[in-house]
């Protein structure tokens, strides 16, 4: 083998020194080329054999028996030629398998066996761990996967181009979303940035709910407000249902738009209101969630944090808003129109549901004052309570509950009060819930608490009874054990009171007499022995 390499090296030197185009050297040059090709197959074969021989017995790659038989047969065919040995006996089954694999190759030449050995190695080289021998084999073999890559290059390029196009489209969409102007909410002169995901869903729901966008023109705004924003005055009276409606003019301005699309002003809407009596007046106005009205004077916008009960769930974003809800359980209200508190109007009988068309004229501030602490003023998401003499809760601007605050309540609709129901509370709460009777709810809650306390008390009594039983049982057991110990027969001491020693007199006498008895027994034994000898 080494001679073959030396010959190939000499032939390579000769090829470099002697020109190949001479006619007298063509046969020698052909022989040298054959030697070079044979040397390549041989070097590859040697590298593959080194890889197989370097595999550890307990390594990660474990070839199968069939694979090892193939490598064995190709190796024997490449090194020794065709099989000329006799088949081993039955006592050597492994040798018989090897002989069968080797002899199955027949008259295959050594070069073909080397090539077949290397080809089999190419099939498993990817699953083998990367070692120095494997690196050497790969360097000798060269890039044998180049043809496979050329066949699939067109298809892979098409797939990659399609993927790149999809990725570029996604990036363009993302860039458009990022570069678009963010929505802004303006509440009380302060802008709030809106979340992209939640606000987009909210805007879609709002676009389905509202009919069309409001224009900047005041006349068109008035027409649309007649369709979408009806100002209803709903009056309930538990005592009298007779009365008529007089003109009251309300000036309400839309201060800002919540979604930042447009800032609009709503012209004053005139209302006709009847003569007031002992009843509760509920003013409901259906508006979109995109707008918030400010009532002039002492009325101002309040945030959701002012209310005790509120809800910001996504399901209620698309619902309409109502301006205010003023209810009373059983106490009258006094209304001061135009800011003159010297001219109050007491509640009187009204019709329950009155649709007030817009009229002409304006009024000043409308103040609602609870008389005798019995009235309730509910706003937005706040739920009023009948405090009946309790101190008024201070608001943000230092104002008490005597004045109505207009707040933004999300997701509430027009609520109509029923007549003559005492203790019934109906408010435009932002959480979409309506509380029932305060007394009923408190009563049911008190009953539940009382029931829970009774059950807890019963459980505690049961536990105490069990503890008492256990204590009595343990006490009885302790007493019985002590009594048995006391009643047990104690060993009577045989020692008299005058005896000075610790041991009893009988033990002492036995200890003293025992040596004499032993000596006497020994004496008797020797005496009998002497008699026998004599």
From Swiss-Prot:
Name of the gene encoding the protein in the UniProt record: ACBD5
Organism: Homo sapiens
InterPro entries in UniProt: ACBD5, Acyl-CoA-binding_prot_CS, Acyl-CoA-binding_protein, Acyl-CoA-binding_sf, FERM/acyl-CoA-bd_prot_sf
Residue positions, PTM N6-acetyllysine: 469
ACB domain boundaries: 41-130
Sites where the protein binds an acyl-CoA: 52-61, 72-76, 98, 117
Family: Belongs to the ATG37 family.
Record-linked CDD domains: ACBP (cd00435)
Protein name as annotated: Acyl-CoA-binding domain-containing protein 5
Keyword Plastid: no
Residues with Phosphothreonine modification: 400
Domain of life: Eukaryota
One of the record's GO cellular component terms: peroxisomal membrane
Spans through the membrane: 506-526
